[in-house]
Amino acid sequence: MRVILLASFAMLLSTLTQAQDINMPPQNPYLANSSYSMGHGNPSQQDAVSQSGPSGPSQTLRPDQIQYQHTGPAHFGAATSGVYPDGKRVFWSNGIDRIVKIDYDSWEVVAEHFFPGAEVYDEERANESIAEFNANNSGVFALARTFREMGKLRDLSNIYTVLGQDHIYYVGSKTGLITAYGDADPNDSHSAIIKKAEFQLPPELTGPVMGLNMTYDGWLIVATEHGYIAAIKPDFTESYFIRLQFSDGAEEKETGATGRGWIRNGFAIDDDGGIYIASQDHMHKVIWTGEGLSVDAKEGAWTARYLNSWGEGTGATPSLMGFGEEDQFVVITDGEDLMNVVLFWRNGIPEDWKQLQGAPDRRIAGMLPVDMGDPELAALQSEQSVVVKGYGALVVNNTPRNIPWYLPEQASTLMISMAGSHPEYQPYGVQQFVWNPARQRLENGWVNTDISSPSSVPMASMKSDRVYVIGARDNQWTLEALDWATGESEFYYVIGGQRYNVLFSGTLLDEDGRIHYGTPWGRVRLNTKIEP
């Protein structure tokens, strides 16, 4: 196993012992009372939870350890509800054609709501596709099938969601429609899914919805691809709007289909009203005052440029680092061909802070290249947000090992989607960076070049002090568990073939520490024993 420890011994020792001292982001009381109420977990977007995860040992999972449900395609995440009056929890999840509720204990689908007018993808069609990719997920014919299968994602309209403390599930669509769904019987977790209310963004707020989050006083925050920000009261009776700085002409700045516009991803929120949004060339802090939105520096707002020679901007959702008395940052990867991990001072910049060499803005506190331990590496990009745990920031390599000569470079996403587990294409590399508060600088932590995470969003566990990713070995999908402090592989589970492709989904932990994630056609949970 090749793990490169890049930190000093003193820094490594500090990292090893910091788990017990980490400040977690505060719980938002208006979100579901669980560890995962929205994409990336909570408003801070860290992809880190407090509970333990699996602890091994390495094994090939038995069929009775794998719980799979057909949900239709593109269920990339699932929000965990709080406890209902009937004593149960459910998972809420949505995709191209439907919303589902899955029982927390049994993993059975207990309710479905199909989107009007959407093509319905049944299980027979799913099984045919899975069988084709199990037979062959490499070569020209497999790529043709991949084009066909990935083409249906163009119909994905409702990707960003938030689950409230009252079991209301908010869904933002690319048409600017925010819909609140709930239970036909609020006391029955298994009751039918019904539409409660709708809010349509005004026509002048153009662009698909590219993020949905909730402030710590319970207001929904929405961002559109063209740089408009909305604050909406959860009962949809009041709203405020603002446009980000430097967004003039954003309608003409997309570099591809939806998801390649001026704003490409979701955003983070802190408990003081700070909203952190990445646009094509800038990181923005917008202030929610409780009575409106502000981009005024006098209110604490700011805008800072980051490097973007690639031209498409960051592929990362901003993640917050540091709470309480800790140094506080917002973290992204930038738009360089060889991307950097970039830390911005979240609030005031220290008076004696000097602008870093090569950094385009004084607000940047740290900027290091993601080179996977190879100083000769010329290009690497990722579509995943930066996983943050304590002062650690972790990224994965999503650049395929090979791209067939007849495909343009822009088609690289295809190679890590339906073909992501194939040894010919699968990317390798996980890298961690660490903020050193004593030296006030960002440092390299470690690199593991033996682990492949083709397209999954990793998840860190505070209690286990591990990071989990859905990886691949020998064209089989796996769960990989790495020591957060050292990067060493602790164990792995072999899950199986193409039914269990992670396809850009989050690697999630439920309240009891069981791994679950989305697949091309459903959702799967690994029902293995978890140490308390």
Q: What is the role of each PLM region?
A:
Residues A19-V140, D166-I168, T528-P532:
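Sequence/structural signature of beta-propeller modules
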Residues P73-G82, E119-A131, R148-T161, P203-N213, ...:
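Repeated scaffold domains used in trafficking and secretory/extracellular systems
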Residues Y84-G87, L163-D166, M214-D217, I269-D272, ...:
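Residue-level detector of Asp-centered blade-edge/turn motifs that repeat once per structural unit
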Residues I96-W107, T175-D185, H226-K233, D281-W288, ...:
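Structural motif
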Residues F133-N158, T175-L177, G182-T215, D235-R264:
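Asp-box/WD-like beta-propeller blade repeats and closely related beta-sheet repeat scaffolds
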Residues F267-A379:
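Long, internal scaffold/assembly segments composed of regular secondary structure
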Residues F329, Q381-S489, Y493:
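Loop/turn-rich, solvent-exposed surfaces of beta-rich toroidal or solenoidal domains
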Residues V502-P532:
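Blade-level signature of beta-propeller repeat domains, shared across WD40, Kelch, NHL, RCC1
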